[in-house]
Amino acid sequence: MLALSTSCVARAGTTKFLEDYRIDFEDGYGVRSDDEEDSHAISAAKTLAAVAGSHLAPKNIGIRIKPLSTAGMRRALKTLALFVDGLHKARNAQTSGLKHLIITLPKVTNAEQVATLVEILDAYEKEHHLGHGFFSIELIVETPSAFLGRDGTIPMASFLHSSAGRCRSLHFGVYDFTSSLGIGSAGQSIDHLACDFARIWMQIAASLAPNITVSDGIISRLPLVPKENTQDAREQFGSAWRYNYQQMMRSLANGYYQGWDLHPCQLPIRHIANTVFVLRELDGAVSRLKTFVARASQASHVGGVFDDRASVLGLLNFFDRAVSSGVLHPDELLASGVNVAEVRSSI
């Protein structure tokens, strides 16, 4: 455990601290004049092209446009067009390492909105001679109508079908969803029971399509460094830090391995939560899997914990997460006697 802890800390200093980033033109951006948003879309494209492929660029990057509702569609599509065109021109003018771009679509209420975005992205790829799949999309579901239709169907499933394979994840909008249910501001938190229900519904919908992940919503209580060095300020900072950590650990335990961070102060907490989540369960998970393999994939138990094929699949999910989060390296798992690929192919 100590060796693994030391190595993962060492890797943290050599890997990108920020892995996923969205340039926001929706709620976080607010209402601006058309001229102002036009200029920001163009300048954002130039900036992205300049840093893409460098050590400054996150692994995954994209923009969040406004909703494709009747009221917002014109502005959303104009911003998208200016951004994509500006990015294309900048990529031609200077070498860019940008290999793909993620378009985040908020407040999705029907499958037609998704189909419209897909049609537009198809056209952009052809127009700018980009390979198919250069654009992928994320869908933010934040209204009750996205979870249950009047006819008893699950609209989210039709969203995924309409994405034509471009959708990579479903994201949860905490505040729009809870507001739609009549929940007051005091109850609008990421751990509200209504949010738990919604995220489970999202997991079920995501399981119907391949390679779709579910991202948790925002934690609005920010652990801002206090401006004044007073005991009260320090206590508020510590309380906010603990709250963020507890909510992130809760999300990880429930299978939501991604969430929205609004402020840089939240990033260290997320890294700590991911690391603790893996390391505190690692020894037990390794022991359970090795015992299961030693018994030729028959049911087994370690320390009173029963394992069969179904629970071992959960262990494999854990190890996949440990590697994808950067806490563990695949070679470290092999050195501990765990070969995830081999076990997965044998059960």
What does each model-identified segment do?
Residues 1-347:
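Expand to "…catalyze enediolate/carbanion chemistry for C-C bond making/breaking, isomerization
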